[in-house]
Amino acid sequence: LISIVGNTKDSIILDFFSGSATTAHAVMQLNAEDGGNRRFICVQLPELCDEKSEAYKAGYKNICEIGKERIRRAGKKIIEEKGDQIGIDDEEKKPLDIGFKVFKLDTSNLRIWDNTPITGDNQIEMFTERMNSMIDSIKDDRTDMDVVYEVMLKMGVPLDVPVQYIGVNEKVVYKVVYKVVH
């Protein structure tokens, strides 16, 4: 279906009900066959698997987990079958891209300052507690990359822009190069 429906080799295919990621699998397969550079965006609510289902027994708690595993397996199978190069008939072979990123809609990764008025006898203690809670402004269950991607989204930077890790004075700095045209 993808190869028929007005698709070019650099299309972005969107699937809002991705289920087990059939569309992603098909896009990767078509790219391997014709040397295309199609990308896919799959959206799926984390619908829970029935506890009696084979998927659940295999360790998949929701449909998203099934889809991610299918994409991983599809990529691995394509590499095994086609090698790691595409464009067999092309003079210039390019590496086959089987990578993908998974994003989850969630609240901000950053703690939000509590600006409600402080009243009562222990105002200094409450203010000190609020200040101390902001020393590390990233929520405990979040990663550095969660924050990097949140900032990229807020700045309008596409999420497929490469992120580089650079060590500076024993710290990690994330470099995102994106040309903004005004």
Q: Could you say what each language-model-derived stretch is?
A:
Residues S11-L30, M152:
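A phosphate-binding catalytic loop at a beta-strand-loop-alpha-helix junction
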Residues L1-D10, N31-H182:
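Accessory, often C-terminal, charged low-complexity segments
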